[in-house]
Amino acid sequence: MTNFDSKKLNKHWTIEDSISTYGIDKWGDQYFSINSLGNISITPNRNSKKTIDLFKLVNEIKSREINTPLILRFNDILKDRITELNNAFSQAIETYNYKNIFQGVFPIKCNQQKNVLEKIIEYGDYWDFGLEVGSKSELLIGLSLLENKKSLLICNGYKDKKYIEIAILARKLGKQPIIVIEQIDEVQRIIEAVKNLRSTPILGIRSKLSSKSSGRWGKSVGDNSKFGLSIPEIMLTIKELKEASLINEMKLLHFHIGSQISDISVIKDALQEASQIFVELSKLGAPMKYIDVGGGLGIDFDGTKTSSNTSTNYSLQNYANDVVATIKDSCEVNNIQHPIIISESGRAIVSHCSVLIFDVLGTSHVSSQIKVSHQKKTSLIIKNLIDTHNQLKNLRNKKEDLSEIIELWNDAKKFKKDCLVAFRLGFISLGERAYAEELTWACAKEISSHLDNEKIIHPDLSEITETLSSTYYANLSVFKSIPDTWAINQIFPIIPIHRHLEEPICKGNFADLTCDSDGKLNNFIDNGKIKSLLNLHRPEENNDYLIGIFMAGAYQEALGNFHNLFGNTNVIHIDINEDNTYKIKNIIKENSKSEILELLDYSSDNLVESIRINTEFAINNKTLSIEEARKLIDQIETSLRKSSYLSE
């Protein structure tokens, strides 16, 4: 690891400084905080005294030879999120004197992991919490896991004949599947299946809303949205169901306005439109019993409580209040019975419970490469840079003049560009070009050393911070473990899980293990804004520098891919005890290289045998000894059994 000047450490750095730097008091939502040791603490029930030191936990897990990168999943946080959601709706129902109940479902697509779904069903059983499925595979999962006869199984997605028949027959098992009509051609398939099976389903209908949504998923609504029926199609569906004597099975209205809705006004508009559609369906003769408000309940990734894409300008209680109040108002005006309210709030349930931990393998610091020394022979173009550097050094003893500093920095950039042109034309050597780059970095370092942070962000000087920034090499694959950062520029809270009694004197970003330029983490939360560099510590010799990515429990594992053949990480499910000890409930082991290769139809045995044959040729040609061949095969066989990530 790179050495650093200990004199630059701020001995007065406090935990409060770290809290302010990383904003954990805002986005942590009382689940995550910094303790007196300078480590991240996990408090699964927010205001309770039950807490655990995350850094200590990770080290104890590693002592079991379970290596990073790894996902820690805190069951108690998952339980708390389900409880909070149900309590919020219970409070809203009581406040507004609503004459029915809330009955949530979890959309399996958010996190299909068996252990997660089992815990959601266990923790939600008191409220008859159900599941939402969007494919035949998810339908089979839902049917196998849901045992509570009152829990709902909302059947969304494209539906062929088999999907519909399975859902209809599942009613005879005592299940509560509701087939939601999302495409107009599903109506005739349902009618045909009912005739063939002589059994009736519970039906719902998904409406395309005209209300405008916002944010990254704003196109989930409107006439061109992927799913749902237009108003004319809804009218046609009602007509066809009446003709087939199935109108009495139409009991649910569903709508969806996108994921992670940041602005509560968008939700209110959609609720008003959907509530009126619900009323009209009742007037058309359908015995409407449920209204499914879909997903969209957002979480506050940056802690600013604003309508930015990384936040929400409403609380969970605000959301529940608006859902309940709006539906009630529409029903009472039209003398319609209050329906059971369903939500498909996946991200809000599972995001907080998962923390991705990775270690830093090494760093690259531009400042460590600055070794400016006088060279005997220098071209005029290099001398210009030397003069600029000397002028900046002389400013140390002069009154700070921002305009002069800006002028000198612009000169340095111009002279560096001149050197590049000269190198391309063959007028200067590779060594001289290296010297020019070192001089430019030295100029940036001089400016940074005697300007405070407020002036360094002047538009003409802001790139200096980027110039002097560090790259931290992360032992993970962005594409496997946190793909939304690459695919949709999603921002997650990222923070060291220890050393918060020390000032993070570096600014840097992360490069992952893949051979892909997109494999970087370079967008970070900054008090409602997005910054490209994160405050970080210099890694220490022989000590792991551990980083946590928080609120990453939704979608990431399902969407991750095997880019460069990096596989699944270790996943550990944790229960925290009342005495602040913990219990490891489940360990889901990472993929070995052999397992990853077999997913792509490579046989590990055949691979080893192929290499062994090559070693025999090499032995015969005397380019490889028998001992070297044995060592090579042993290394390969051992490697195939081990993780795809780097380890000691």
From Swiss-Prot:
Pfam families: Arg_decarb_HB, Orn_Arg_deC_N. The modification N6-(pyridoxal phosphate)lysine is found at K109. The keyword Metal-binding applies. Pathway: Amine and polyamine biosynthesis; agmatine biosynthesis; agmatine from L-arginine: step 1/1. This is Biosynthetic arginine decarboxylase. It comes from the Bacteria. It comes from Prochlorococcus marinus (strain MIT 9515). Its cofactor is Mg(2+); pyridoxal 5'-phosphate.
